Amino acid sequence: SLVGDVLQQIQDMMQEHFDKERVEADGDTAVDLETGDYSEDEAVSKMIIHALYEQRDSALLLLTRSQGSSLEGAVDELIRVVTIHYRMLADAMTEKLGMEPLEESFVHWISHMQIDTFIYMITHIEKEEEALRYIQQATHYMVNGWYGMFRSLGNDRT
């Protein structure tokens, strides 16, 4: 289906990005805490935006009119997948920093925030060019908030 195709395309892009981050999670996260490099996150976000806006009508159907269809739980499924990924990233960060794991409800909330960023964008911003400017700011906020949280929690231990 057209709506299912856009969902699959987004899921594939997310999975490819998550696979890269999984490999990076085995690296030196202390460096990431200092640099806050989010170029890969921004690049993937731009690809997702392009896919969403290229098929905006289908994306809007998925997000606003899928009740009662086989895709009714699509957003919840995206959040579930993101939560699993963020749990892995959070556990890698807290382990390397010698910290207690983050609460599951907190990791789940972060996942909602990530997906809600795109839902807000596609339902409220009509032009792809404006969405690209929006996502640059949103990505900066989310990535720096993520790393800032670990810097802050790490400093609280000392």
What do these predicted regions represent?
Residues 62-79, 133-146:
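C-terminal/domain-terminus segments
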Residues 89-142, 150-158:
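Hydrophobic/aromatic-rich alpha-helical bundle segments in the mid-to-C-terminal region
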Residues 1-19:
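An amphipathic alpha-helix adjacent to DNA-recognition modules
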Residues 18-32, 49-69:
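Amphipathic alpha-helical segments used for helix-helix packing
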Residues 39, 43-57, 69-94, 105-112:
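Amphipathic alpha-helical packing segments from all-alpha helical-bundle domains
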Residues 13, 17, 21, 85, ...:
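Solvent-exposed amphipathic alpha-helical surface segments
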